[in-house]
C-alpha cells in the first residue's frame, strides 16, 4: 500500500540583500541589511517514526497475565449487566475467563484458544463450542486470539504502519493509520506516548462499523505501563458497550485453566 508522506512545518524564509559597497574617503559603509534566520523544517516522517518507536517500546511484553476485573456490559439489545471476572492468559496460547454473577456465584467460564471458543453456562448448564470466528460474531470486530489478548493487555490493536496523518496539539499526538480493516486514529500522550484513545472506522466505506477504545488510570507495575480502566464501544447494526476496571493484576506468574464439561450439561 502506497504511503502518503505529509510534511508539517514552516517554509524557511531567506531574506538577504547584497550590500553595495561605496568607497568614499577610504571609509567602508556599514551593511545595515537585516538577515532573517532560516526556520528549520519539521520532518513529519521523523516525528512519526519517533512516536511509533515509543509506542512499540510501551508494548507490554509478557508470558502470562492474570487479573480480577469489574465488567459493565451493555449489549446491542440495550440490556445492561455487571459482573466480576477472573482473567488468565498465556500469550499466543489461551485466554481463560470465569465470570461471577450476583452473590459471587460463577455464571460463565470461557476458554479461548487459537482455533476455538468454548463456553460453560453454569447457570443454565449448557456447554457451547464454536470456532474462533465466534469472536467476530459477538463483537462485530475482526478478532482472533492474538488481537483479543492485545486488547485485554492494553497494547495497540489494528495499528498499521501506513500512517497517513500526523497531528500534535494540546499535549496529544494523533496518528492516523490505514489498514486492511480499519482507519485507526490513535491518540497518544505527548510526553510518554501512552495510549489515550483508539478510534476505528471501517476501511470499507460501504460498511458502517466503528469502534472507540479509551484507556485511562495508568499504573506502572514491574516496569510495565498498564491502563487499569478501559471503555470499548462498537457500533454497526447495534451498539455494544463494555467497561473494564482492573482491580488486581499480575504478569508472568504461574496460571492454570481449569475447564471440564460435566456430563449433565447440554451440548450446544
Residue ranges and their predicted role:
Residues 1-4:
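Positively charged n-region of N-terminal signal peptides that target proteins for export
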Residues 13-16:
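C-terminal motif of bacterial Sec signal peptides marking the signal peptidase cleavage site
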Residues 18-70, 76-80, 266-268:
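N-terminal leader/targeting segments and the immediate start of mature chains
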Residues 19, 23, 165-268:
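Gly/Pro-enriched, hydrophobic low-complexity segments
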Residues 57-65, 76-81, 88-93, 206, ...:
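Edge/loop elements at the starts and ends of beta-strands within beta-rich repeat scaffolds
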Amino acid at each position: 500500500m502506497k504511503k502518503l508522506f505529509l510534511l508539517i512545518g514552516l517554509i524557511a524564509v531567506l531574506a538577504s540583500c547584497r550590500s553595495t559597497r561605496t568607497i568614499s574617503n577610504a571609509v567602508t559603509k556599514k551593511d545595515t541589511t537585516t538577515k532573517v534566520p532560516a526556520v528549520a523544517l519539521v520532518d513529519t516522517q521523523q516525528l512519526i517514526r519517533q512516536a511509533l518507536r515509543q509506542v512499540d517500546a510501551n508494548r507490554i511484553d509478557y508470558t502470562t497475565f492474570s487479573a480480577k476485573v469489574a465488567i459493565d456490559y451493555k449489549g446491542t439489545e440495550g440490556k445492561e449487566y455487571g459482573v466480576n471476572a477472573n482473567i488468565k492468559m498465556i500469550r499466543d496460547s489461551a485466554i481463560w475467563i470465569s465470570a461471577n454473577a450476583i452473590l459471587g456465584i460463577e455464571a460463565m467460564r470461557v476458554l479461548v484458544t487459537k482455533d476455538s471458543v468454548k463456553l460453560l453456562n453454569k447457570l443454565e448448564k449448557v456447554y457451547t463450542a464454536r470456532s474462533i470466528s465466534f469472536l467476530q460474531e459477538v463483537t462485530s470486530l475482526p478478532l482472533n486470539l492474538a488481537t483479543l489478548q492485545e486488547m485485554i493487555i492494553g497494547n495497540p490493536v489494528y495499528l498499521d504502519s501506513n500512517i497517513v496523518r500526523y497531528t500534535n496539539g494540546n499535549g496529544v499526538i494523533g496518528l492516523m493509520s490505514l489498514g486492511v480493516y480499519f482507519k485507526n486514529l490513535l491518540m497518544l500522550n505527548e510526553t510518554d506516548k501512552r495510549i489515550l484513545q483508539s478510534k476505528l472506522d471501517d476501511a470499507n466505506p460501504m460498511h458502517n462499523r466503528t469502534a472507540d477504545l479509551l484507556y485511562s488510570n495508568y499504573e506502572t507495575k514491574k516496569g510495565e505501563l498498564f491502563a487499569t480502566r478501559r471503555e470499548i464501544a462498537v457500533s454497526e447494526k447495534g451498539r455494544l458497550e463494555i467497561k473494564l476496571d482492573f482491580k488486581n493484576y499480575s504478569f508472568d506468574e504461574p496460571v492454570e485453566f481449569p475447564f471440564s464439561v460435566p456430563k449433565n450439561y447440554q451440548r450446544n
